[in-house]
């Protein structure tokens, strides 16, 4: 398996004694061993360390509304503690509880957003039962191919084995739980994110569909190929932007299979998306997992198995697959990347040949990702009371550098913009005299 950065989804759990339902369940408590009060600090985490839960009010990608934690003795497999909460509010960005344990080696299991979770887990009495629960194949809720909602977040899980619980901590000053030496428990979504951006030719596009998506997911990484498929799933357009989103469960594809060599006309089990133009043209784009430069420099010949080097078609959970596409009269051009599935921190748009990133301080950075040719104008327009620099009348800026790696940063002030409203629009090579021009990207204040 390729080594890619792990992207996780986290959840802050601090001291909240009156929340949820938890108890120690050691069947033979040792009176010589003192109780340990453990502070579990888990976040909807990303590799950049800026984690959150329940802060994404647009797509609810970080929504956690129910959580279970079960703890087992690493040697005997007996359950020694558990915690359940089925009603974490949407405004709860810090969810808090403690757990009481005895010292020793412990295995921690975390599960989030599973329907009727406490009832389903009531019969779990040892680690063998828990492993079975984690390995069961479940059907993904059909809505999760399109989005999560406030009341129906993506299923998530995480397991930490052989964690040392040491003596110490009190009910008022619990010890921090640092799994594998990290400060946070990091939950993983069971789905990957598909992000398709049409950077040219959107006016000719009829629809984008995800094909061959896996029906099933597990709470631990899959080990076998999908056997049932869902869809096609029409991707969801983000407002009036040129961005389409969808989500897909993890799908293992054996290395002996590639596009056109799967043994069936539908190319199952390979995930792909299909673009259909208003003129009836259809383009199929296989989804691959590949780090680094694309062999040959062109995505489609490599992704369709036309080169000696074959890609991996396995889709991994909690990854963000990003495509930037130009639709031309008789073909399409595809740019591809995989990145961390971040929610709350830097908001980034990947255009064709450039990126636009906005950090929490309002610094807007435009960076070229390739050598560009004229015309290459990235125009930023501040909206709804936002402005650039220190003058409220400065509501637009442009970036025209051509060199690969060229970059420029602008400061946008969005203090006057209401939460949930647009504060920045991105246009690429806009016709300033045209009416009804749709922005390539709209940034929303969170």
Curated annotation (Swiss-Prot):
Q: Where in the cell is it found?
A: Fimbrium; Cell outer membrane
Q: Which GO terms describe its cellular component?
A: cell outer membrane; pilus; pilus tip
Q: What is its main location?
A: other
Going by the UniProt record, its keywords in alphabetical order are: Cell outer membrane, Fimbrium, Lipoprotein, Membrane, Palmitate, Signal, Virulence
Knockout mutant characteristics: Mildly increased autoaggregation.
Q: Where is the lipid attached (S-diacylglycerol cysteine)?
A: 21
Which positions carry the signal peptide feature in this UniProt record?
1-20
Q: What role does it play? A: Tip subunit of the minor fimbriae. These filamentous pili are attached to the cell surface; they mediate biofilm formation, adhesion onto host cells and onto other bacteria that are part of the oral microbiome. They play an important role in invasion of periodontal tissues and are recognized as major virulence factors. Fimbrium subunits from different strains have highly divergent sequences, and this correlates with pathogenicity.
What is noted besides the main data? The name (minor fimbrium subunit) does not indicate the abundance of the protein, but is derived from the greater length of the major fimbriae. In strain ATCC 33277 and strain ATCC BAA-1703 / FDC 381, major fimbriae are 300 - 1600 nM in length and about 5 nm in diameter. In contrast, minor fimbriae are only about 80 - 120 nm long. This length difference is observed only in a small number of strains, including strain ATCC 33277 and strain ATCC BAA-1703 / FDC 381, and is due to a loss of function mutation in FimB, a protein that restricts fimbrial length in other strains.
Family assignment from sequence similarity: Belongs to the bacteroidetes fimbrillin superfamily. FimB/Mfa2 family.
Q: What does the annotation say about its assembly with partners?
A: Component of the fimbrium tip. Minor fimbriae are composed of a structural subunit, most often Mfa1, and the accessory subunits Mfa3, Mfa4 and Mfa5. Fimbrium assembly occurs by linear, head-to-tail oligomerization of fimbrial subunits. This is mediated via insertion of a C-terminal beta-strand from one subunit into a groove in the N-terminal domain of the following subunit. Mfa3 is required for Mfa4 and Mfa5 insertion into the fimbrium.
Protein name (database record) = Minor fimbrium tip subunit Mfa3
């Amino acid at each position: 398996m390729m080594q890619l950065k792990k992207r996780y989804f986290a959840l802050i759990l601090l001291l909240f004694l009156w929340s949820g339902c938890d108890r120690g369940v050691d069947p033979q408590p040792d009176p010589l061993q003192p109780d340990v009060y453990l502070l579990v600090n888990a976040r909807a985490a990303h590799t950049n360390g800026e984690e959150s839960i329940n802060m994404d009010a647009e797509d609810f990608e970080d929504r956690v509304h129910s959580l279970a934690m079960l703890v087992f003795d690493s040697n005997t497999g007996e359950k020694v503690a558990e915690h359940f909460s089925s009603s974490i509010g949407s405004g709860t960005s810090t969810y808090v509880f403690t757990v009481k344990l005895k010292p020793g080696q412990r295995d921690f299991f975390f599960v989030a957003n599973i329907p009727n979770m406490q009832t389903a887990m009531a019969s779990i009495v040892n680690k063998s039962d828990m492993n079975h629960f984690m390995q069961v194949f479940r059907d993904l809720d059909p809505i999760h191919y399109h989005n999560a909602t406030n009341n129906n977040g993506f299923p998530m899980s995480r397991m930490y084995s052989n964690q040392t619980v040491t003596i110490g901590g009190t009910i008022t000053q619990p010890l921090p739980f640092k799994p594998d030496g990290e400060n946070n428990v990091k939950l993983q979504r069971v789905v990957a994110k598909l992000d398709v951006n049409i950077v040219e030719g959107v006016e000719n596009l009829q629809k984008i569909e995800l094909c061959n998506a896996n029906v099933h997911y597990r709470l631990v990484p899959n080990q076998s190929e999908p056997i049932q498929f869902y869809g096609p799933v029409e991707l969801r357009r983000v407002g009036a932007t040129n961005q389409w989103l969808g989500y897909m469960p993890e799908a293992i594809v054996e290395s002996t299979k590639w596009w056109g060599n799967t043994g069936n006309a539908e190319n199952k089990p390979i995930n792909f998306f299909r673009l259909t133009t208003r003129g009836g043209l259809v383009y199929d784009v296989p989804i691959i997992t590949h780090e680094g430069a694309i062999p040959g420099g062109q995505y489609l010949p490599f992704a369709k198995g036309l080169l000696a080097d074959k890609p991996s078609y396995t889709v991994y959970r909690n990854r963000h697959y990003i495509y930037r596409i130009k639709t031309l009269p008789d073909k399409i051009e595809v740019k591809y990347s995989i990145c961390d599935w971040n929610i709350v921190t830097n908001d980034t748009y990947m255009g064709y040949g450039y990126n636009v990133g906005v950090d929490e301080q309002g610094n807007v950075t435009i960076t070229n990702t390739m050598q560009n040719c004229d015309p290459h104008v990235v125009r930023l327009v501040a909206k709804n009371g936002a402005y650039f620099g220190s003058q409220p009348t400065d509501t637009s800026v442009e970036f025209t550098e051509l060199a690969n790696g060229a970059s420029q940063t602008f400061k946008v002030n969005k203090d006057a913009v209401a939460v949930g409203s647009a504060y920045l629009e991105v246009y690429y090579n806009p016709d300033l005299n045209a009416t009804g021009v749709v922005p390539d990207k709209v940034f929303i204040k969170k």
